[in-house]
Amino acid sequence: MTAEASEKFSGRRIDFHAHAILPSYVDALKKLKIDATAEEGFPLPKWSVENHLQFMDDAGIDFTILSMATPHISDKIAAREINEEFAELCRRFPKKFGFVATLPLPNVEGSIEEFKFATEKLGALGVKVASNSDGVYLGDERLDPIFAALNEKNSLVIIHPSPARLLPRENVVTGKVMALFEYPTDTTRAVLNMLANRTLEKFPRLKIVVPHCGSFLPYMKQRAGSMFQMLASMNLMEPVNFSAGFKKLFFDTAGDPMPEQFDMLLKVASLDKIIFGTDYPYVPAKVVLGRKKLFDEEILRRGWTEKIYVENARALLEG
């Protein structure tokens, strides 16, 4: 990224995890007969650019990286329309918004084409990928060609959870509202699959961001690392440099984080790998703003303000 382009990323905070509910996305859901409430367990939140800008001002956010909402859409035509609308929004507010492109995964050829178009023609800063797309998880070797294309361009890759295909939805609360349990579960499943299948070793130039304070990865790191080693010794899986792969990951703070989550995350990730995120509008403005004082005080007390709010994000965007 050029010095001129990087100027727009200076400021009090960079929000690395936020969404826009665009008309093209809502139209795509209707055309594809996808019921967001049925799939996610809650309706799409209301969104407008005016409300988002007001939220940013209230929260002290100078620049936001937008991505498509959930449910994930794998339709190639819809992905193009959504990316074009994101690009238009960012052209209207170039010092406020950037975006990461939607890819029609698991369509590999279509995703490579859309990645190139979105980054070369529309100005996308990278891509958003679902933890699984129609049951094909990140780390699946069938997705290697798209990761090779992303790796070639040192691409930013922001992971977002998607519901697993088979869930215990009846009489089990965790299967009804995805954000409660299934989102962090599926993110964790996807990243462990990437580590097990050496995605980060094969494609070392990828800049991968794991959402929601790492989901369950801080808890799982030691267990998974030990299990991978044991399984390899039993010839049940190929040897994997688990620690080296894990160290490559970045983590955002989206999802109403608390000090306890920071403590756990810092046991497995270095401070320069943590970036600020809000998950707006899925986390409503009043919730983010209600936590703002506590969040700011905790970050300030630990001397992390510039690192987490600005410096780490700028380094990731400009690297």
What are these regions (language model features)?
Residues 1-16, 20-63, 84, 113-117, ...:
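Mid-to-C-terminal alpha-helical segments outside catalytic/metal-binding sites
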Residues 10, 19-46, 165-187, 224-248:
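Active-site gating loops and adjacent loop-to-helix segments of metal-dependent hydrolytic enzymes
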Residues 14-18, 64-66, 98-102, 127-129, ...:
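Hydrophobic faces of well-ordered beta-strands that scaffold small-molecule active sites
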Residues 19, 162-163, 214, 281:
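Catalytic metal-binding/acid-base residues of hydrolase active sites
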Residues 56-62, 89-97, 194-206, 243-249, ...:
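A structural motif corresponding to the C-terminal end of an alpha-helix
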Residues 62-197:
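Active-site gating/metal-coordination segments in enzymes
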Residues 195-198, 202-244:
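Aromatic-lined glycan-binding groove of carbohydrate-active enzymes
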